[in-house]
């Protein structure tokens, strides 16, 4: 049953979350998507044609494709069942090939990368460390590690902006690798998101088909990897309206709700514990810093 009446929850005011990223002493660059942010970093830090980067064995295409597109030679390091880095295997890789960079990820805010990064920097301090913090976009204060050279997050994975990603870098990045804004992407994404909002109330299947079609079209645009593009003016203005604390709370509560619905209905198989570990992390507030 829908609620009607004069009593409403409070209007949420912005808390300046993205403005406060400047407090970490990094150069801040906003782009339109996470994969293009990774491409921008990949182009900025690639040294030569023989450059080797290590990626986690558990990662999606949008994490590996930017480095393949920019000509990096890719090797993969192992993860343990709790999604932390297998440090013994990592050391073997470091000893067996000349590694120029490594991409890490703090999965769900519970798979700390601090010790592995310390090992990498002790092995050779010039190895570039890139961390994808998309799972911890609103918890950077909790996980921040000064040894990391580039922090990258897909903002649009966490909040309702039409496009958006952010890079926190130690050095100023080369704008020559950046293209111009393409409004078609952000405009069509904004239309799709508006239709999705309408669908949440109407449950109209035609509206659902329309917004899914628009989103699929837009994803095809960024899959082309022609050039990294900046965040749209529309999305950048949206960031000023964000309350990061409320979003982090809502995401965590949603995950708790998911756990309660699953409630023993999902059978875990030995050696395939990713979902099980994820549910454990979310249920332990002190350990998990989603999103």
For the regions a language model picked out, list residue spans one by one.
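Short, solvent-exposed loop/turn segments at secondary-structure junctions
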Residues: 35-37, 59-61, 82, 107-110, ...
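Active-site regions of enzymes building and remodeling cell-envelope glycoconjugates
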Residues: 71-76, 127, 147-152, 264-268, ...
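PLP-dependent aminotransferase class I/II
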Residues: 22-29, 59, 103, 179-291
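PLP-dependent aminotransferase-like
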Residues: 12-27, 36, 42-124, 130, ...
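Active-site PLP attachment segment
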Residues: 148-199
């Amino acid at each position: 049953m829908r609620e009607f009446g004069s009593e409403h929850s409070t209007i949420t005011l912005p808390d300046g979350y993205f403005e406060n990223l400047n407090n970490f002493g990094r150069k801040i660059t906003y782009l339109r998507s996470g994969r293009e942010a990774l491409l921008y970093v990949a182009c900025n830090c690639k040294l030569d044609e023989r450059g080797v980067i290590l990626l986690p064995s558990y990662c999606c295409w949008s994490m590996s494709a930017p480095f393949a597109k920019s000509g990096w030679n890719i090797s993969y390091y192992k993860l343990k069942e709790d999604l932390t880095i297998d440090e013994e295997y990592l050391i073997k890789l470091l000893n067996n090939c000349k590694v120029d960079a490594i991409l890490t990820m703090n999965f769900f805010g519970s798979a700390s990368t601090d010790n592995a990064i310390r090992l990498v920097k002790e092995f050779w301090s010039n190895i570039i460390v890139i961390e994808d913090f998309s799972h911890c976009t609103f918890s950077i204060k909790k996980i921040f590690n000064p040894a990391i050279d580039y922090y990258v997050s897909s903002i649009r994975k966490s909040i309702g902006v039409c496009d958006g990603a952010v890079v926190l870098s130690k050095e100023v990045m080369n704008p020559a690798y950046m293209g111009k804004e393409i409004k078609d992407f952000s405009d069509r994404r904004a239309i799709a998101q508006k239709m999705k909002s309408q669908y949440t109330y109407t449950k109209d299947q035609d509206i659902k088909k329309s917004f899914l079609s628009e989103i699929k079209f837009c994803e095809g645009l960024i899959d082309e990897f022609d050039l990294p593009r900046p965040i749209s003016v529309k999305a950048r203005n949206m960031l000023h309206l964000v309350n990061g604390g409320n979003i982090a709370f809502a995401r965590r509560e949603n995950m708790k709700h998911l756990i309660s619905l699953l409630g023993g209905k999902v059978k875990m198989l030995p050696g395939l514990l990713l979902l099980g570990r994820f549910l454990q992390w979310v249920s332990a507030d002190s350990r998990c810093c989603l999103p």
